Amino acid sequence: MSLLTEVETLTRNGWGCRCSDSSDPLVVAASIIGILHLILWILDRLFFKCIYRRFKYGLKRGPSTEGVPESMREEYRQEQQNAVDVDDGHFVNIELE
């Protein structure tokens, strides 16, 4: 059995689609999956900047600070900031001739 069940043929009324076994559950499932795939692909292309920005930046939050005293939260923020601040003396400048 072939999954290619739609055949366009020239009929008396013009070009038409003759579907064989269109009530086959496999054909119905494949059609539904194909339509859902197309819809998801279109949505992905329309909103890819929002979606991937959310994954890139939204999931990079620090650990939860729920239940931690404010002084410890501030200390943690300061440690994170110090880890980001880098002394320029650690880098080597290479000049190409």
Curated annotation (Swiss-Prot):
GO terms for biological process: protein complex oligomerization; symbiont genome entry into host cell via pore formation in plasma membrane; symbiont-mediated suppression of host autophagy. Residues 60-80 are annotated as: Disordered. A lipid is attached at C50 (S-palmitoyl cysteine). The keyword Transport applies. The keyword Protein biosynthesis does not apply. GO terms for molecular function: identical protein binding; monoatomic ion channel activity; proton transmembrane transporter activity. The chain crosses the membrane at residues 23-43. The record marks W41 as: Seems to be involved in pH gating. GO terms for cellular component: host cell plasma membrane; membrane; virion membrane. It is a single-pass type III membrane protein. InterPro entries: Flu_M2. Residues 1-22 are virion surface. Coiled coil: none annotated. The M2 protein from most influenza A strains is inhibited by amantadine and rimantadine, resulting in viral uncoating incapacity. Emergence of amantadine-resistant variants is usually rapid. The modification Phosphoserine is found at S64. Keywords: Disulfide bond, Host cell membrane, Host membrane, Host-virus interaction, Hydrogen ion transport, Inhibition of host autophagy by virus, Ion channel, Ion transport, Lipoprotein, Membrane, Palmitate, Phosphoprotein, Signal-anchor, Transmembrane, Transmembrane helix, Transport, Viral ion channel, Virion. The record marks H37 as: Essential for channel activity, possibly by being protonated during channel activation, and by forming the channel gate and the selective filter. It is found in: Virion membrane; Host apical cell membrane. Residues 44-97 are intravirion. Cytoplasmic tail plays an important role in virion assembly and morphogenesis. Belongs to the influenza viruses matrix protein M2 family. Homotetramer; composed of two disulfide-linked dimers held together by non-covalent interactions. May interact with matrix protein 1. When the channel is activated, one or more imidazole moieties of His-37 probably become bi-protonated. Forms a proton-selective ion channel that is necessary for the efficient release of the viral genome during virus entry. After attaching to the cell surface, the virion enters the cell by endocytosis. Acidification of the endosome triggers M2 ion channel activity. This is Matrix protein 2.
